């Protein structure tokens, strides 16, 4: 229905993608607190370009401090510990669980995938999810860790 876009200066993935400065994040937090309160925006509705258009956008990317913002109630983050996820990374899952992963993503606000380019779009959607919720490894593969995180988020 309505949206507010906030651009944060960063060269991006094509031009030496760099960390966001503490000054940028401080200003962003201050602005988000104001906007969320003034417009009664739910923290689950704070999204990045790649969450909305994963087939063509990569920003804000894996160096964006989503977890840090979530600690202040400014966006969502999963509640799983490193211990919960420790042995799940790179563990393949059967295809039927990929559908569960996609349903979980739909529940948390990502668009569903359709059309001839299903495999390509699945990879891009998964990479967008990983850039936000599993920033240490962005490979576009739906593994057990991605499934666990998506399941956890779908229940928040």
Which residues does each predicted region cover?
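Oxyanion-hole/transition-state-stabilizing segment in secreted/luminal serine hydrolases
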Residues: 8-16
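C-terminal accessory extensions appended to soluble enzyme cores
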Residues: 131, 144-156
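Flexible, substrate/cofactor-facing loop regions flanked by secondary structure
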Residues: 113-117, 132
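Secretory-pathway/luminal and periplasmic proteins that interact with or process carbohydrate-rich
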Residues: 55-60, 132-139, 156
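Basic/polar, cationic surfaces and motifs that engage anionic cell-wall
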Residues: 17-113, 124, 128, 145-148
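Acidic, glycine-anchored loop motifs typical of Ca2+
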Residues: 116, 139-140
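Short coil-to-beta-strand
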Residues: 1-8
